[in-house]
């Protein structure tokens, strides 16, 4: 049984709105993490082709929206195949955040790629947050496909404010992750300008700690850096968010909520490493297991409507309601 694993959490800047260049940078970071002994490497929300930061500066930008569609990643594509091949060549698990292009509709998606290059699962964010809805669609059921067994342990992933969705979190906890990847866009310190603390560096770190404590898993809090090139590319200098260089606050939290990593300056790129000892999970589980001994399913339980809902369904495979015949 695996007892320890070395992980790598990126804090990096994509090549904004450039699919090919960001895929190349992804592979470079995968190789770097593997060369430093990592068995798993993580990437933030919409890492490919970069988070669409302009949505917080203006409600509509048709030119950038068109560019974004054309540079978003298709799961069945040569670009994804390149990332899979890189994972296999470096024998490392990859948890990838990306803007998914599915027939030119976009979704905030994550993929967990095995160390042999096989895609173990893909998932879409349950619901885009606020202005993200001007770009992205909702999941249609595959948001629940979030935890899989890998060579680095049992790994799960959620994106951004999915971490404040109590029912979705509990569903993920119940799948018994050992390592949780929390993918975020660029995040900034809270300021007294009317912005939400829960969207800040400090607020999201609190969310990560809470997730670790509630799930008794290691949380790999993965964020993006935005530099002046990104600000200029998306014209966000007058926006409410992501208007100045920075955004990085990647971190690693233990199953009792303690921070296990030292921060990288917010405007700098780098990779955070840690050796995770799964013994710490057992220490926490001995005290609390919200899906086990510290629960009351006879009183409170979660119902789930499972399965992916397709837009077109064959009537032959669609359940027909049965009407009971009343006796005369």
Swiss-Prot record:
Its EC number is 3.5.5.1, 3.5.5.5. The active site is at residues 45, 125, 160. Pfam families: CN_hydrolase. The keyword Hydrolase applies. Keywords: Hydrolase. InterPro entries: C-N_Hydrolase, C-N_Hydrolase_sf, Nitrilase/CN_hydratase_CS, Nitrilases_CHs. Residues 5-278 form the CN hydrolase domain. It catalyses: a nitrile + 2 H2O = a carboxylate + NH4(+); 4-chlorophenylacetonitrile + 2 H2O = 4-chlorophenylacetate + NH4(+). It is an enzyme of class 3 (hydrolase). GO terms for molecular function: arylacetonitrilase activity; hydro-lyase activity. Gene3D superfamilies: Carbon-nitrogen hydrolase. Belongs to the carbon-nitrogen hydrolase superfamily. Nitrilase family. Nitrilase that hydrolyzes preferentially phenylacetonitrile, (R,S)-mandelonitrile, and 3-indolylacetonitrile. This is Arylacetonitrilase. It comes from Aspergillus niger (strain ATCC MYA-4892 / CBS 513.88 / FGSC A1513).
